[in-house]
């Protein structure tokens, strides 16, 4: 039997909104952070930021099952939990929803803790001053990304009713008892965070840190989400203006999936396990799910060799 290993996915996360609408909307308790006085140097601040990156939830496989990336195989019945999730079974979704909710808000809490402490960070020389500004920009971007994911997962689509309840917006570090803000207000908060972050020139050599280009990409993505096509084009051009033709060759596309940093990759989380490790039953039998044939690439598409494993 043919085995398919999707290496690239495109899932419209917003389709989960109806299923997750009834989940518990309590903000998780504030995590215990280090003594505020302990964050005095850019090195310590960078370490706390790295912890926030590591806390970011990675449920890409679950999103692919809920989306249209995969279709079942004859082995699907052997992984009944994943099959139930694929079929939008309430029992499985009720397990996933609180994990996502708490996970993204945990990242936001860590970013808030870091941003609160950045005023006390002392710098010596221009290099440390630049690094301090980069850390602040990255923390705001990671916070915005977490809010954006929460919005796409737990709220209705923007174009259905932007004034409908969206998610809870944090305004201070610690526990808060607040109602959900409107989708429109959440988008405004995300846009404000990204607009502040994009002002900081930042082009890290390693792809695991959010760069200024990543902020521009998120601004374009947010504009598309909110139906602001003109803004999406403007920010999209800023990103495309930094590309070159080599990024769109077979070698360039293949480089996106290598472990080393690559200038054609806008951003990638540092992870230690494969997103899709759970799809395989065994090397001999094959996979529980296979790539949706409707998402296949024609032979002339340079992405085919890297995105689909025959």
Positions of PLM-derived features:
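Membrane-proximal, proline-rich intrinsically disordered regions
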Residues: 22-66, 304-308
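Short coil/linker segments at helix-helix boundaries
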Residues: 127-132, 153-188
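Conserved, well-structured interaction surfaces
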Residues: 81-153, 199-203
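Inward-facing hydrophobic residues that define packing positions of alpha-helical scaffold repeats
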Residues: 108-111, 187, 194, 236
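Hydrophobic-face positions in mid-chain alpha helices that act as interaction patches
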Residues: 233-310
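Sec-dependent bacterial lipoprotein signal peptides
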Residues: 1-21
